[in-house]
UniProtKB/Swiss-Prot annotation:
It is a single-pass type II membrane protein. The chain crosses the membrane at residues 55-75. The modification Phosphothreonine is found at residue 37. It comes from Homo sapiens. It comes from the Eukaryota. Signal peptide: none annotated. This is Integral membrane protein 2C. PANTHER family: INTEGRAL MEMBRANE PROTEIN 2C (PTHR10962:SF5), INTEGRAL TRANSMEMBRANE PROTEIN 2 (PTHR10962). The gene is ITM2C. The record marks 242-243 as: Cleavage. GO terms for molecular function: amyloid-beta binding; ATP binding. Its main location: membrane. The lineage of its organism: Eukaryota, Metazoa, Chordata, Craniata, Vertebrata.
Amino acid sequence: MVKISFQPAVAGIKGDKADKASASAPAPASATEILLTPAREEQPPQHRSKRGGSVGGVCYLSMGMVVLLMGLVFASVYIYRYFFLAQLARDNFFRCGVLYEDSLSSQVRTQMELEEDVKIYLDENYERINVPVPQFGGGDPADIIHDFQRGLTAYHDISLDKCYVIELNTTIVLPPRNFWELLMNVKRGTYLPQTYIIQEEMVVTEHVSDKEALGSFIYHLCNGKDTYRLRRRATRRRINKRGAKNCNAIRHFENTFVVETLICGVV
């Protein structure tokens, strides 16, 4: 701050000593004072514009990155739903067949062909098999579910439109992962290597009223159908033609061999 003062002109050189004494004493300043304040140094405007521009650039860059990440997420979800899941569904569905020697129907071994559609659900740990009408006889068409979570097997005999439930036989039925690996290994060919057939016999024991207790997979298969429990016959016996009249056969495979399931005592 700069201070500038203006003193008034002296009226005369001569003066009384008393006047000098009084003049030497401090008196209210009658002088006119002007205060000058130095101008503040202003920052160059270009610095503000640069700082504002840099902040705006960061904001735009951040928004662009967010939009890019959202686009990548949506693209990943789209690819997963429409390509990966579709490919996974194709890999878990098999339409295959097997050639085997039939030693059960007659004493002469004849070559037979069995076809079936297989759906394997690895996450849910169950298998669903559809056996169409055999071309050369030998069994009924059926839908079969092997539920490894519940430890149950359900047969839906399409000809009779009835369901039969029994404990899962893990010595015959491969687990979903093992069965999937087997079918993937032979997927390049149409048929599995020629194999053989074994037989198991079931007996109807009781009617099932509470189908929900069988689990959701078997419930959806057997809902609205008469459902019965089965008991596996401990001793094998030769089924003659007369005894076979009261038995229904379902031929299927969930292993490297074919299984003929005889359901006897059919209501």
